[in-house]
């Protein structure tokens, strides 16, 4: 067990070293995470389990949260995407019950789906008293907010939003949630896709981001989309 933990820590060091130098993942880093999933998927599952624990003994570091965020995409393989879109459609139609049911289905597949986590956090106050799904003395809103913050901080650590150092995401939907909740950017328009990158021109800045544009690395998103088309 100690040997596996040491190997995992060495991977963290490699990942964060790359993030500090380049502020982005490169091809070799994606391969390392993919190889870790292939050889030790439980190591990623344990990180996700800790991240989503109601009372974690020791909170994950940003580096660990990042590995959980990216690693989970290799476990769930984007299988939650169709249900996630059903959640969005239900929200547009004002059907909260359907949206909540869809969000729970999404989280059953991907426990750290950022859109589902954020939505459940917002709806937590409306679910107070639900004895089946809300245990006594459990602050659901704080629980979902904590997980969302860990994921958002993890994405923040991958770059600065420039073309040279784009933020890394594993879902296109995560880009807008990141811009809205982490960077407080508003009025976001449709992005331009350039290779493995999504570029947004920003109509205005915020106190957390002052560039005229913001870029995201969607390498993993493209991989997942190709896999889903082949199924």
Feature map (PLM): residue ranges:
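Residue-level recognition of tetratricopeptide repeat
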Residues: 112-113, 148, 152-155
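Canonical positions in the second alpha-helix
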Residues: 105-106
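Bacterial Sec-dependent N-terminal signal peptides
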Residues: 1-25
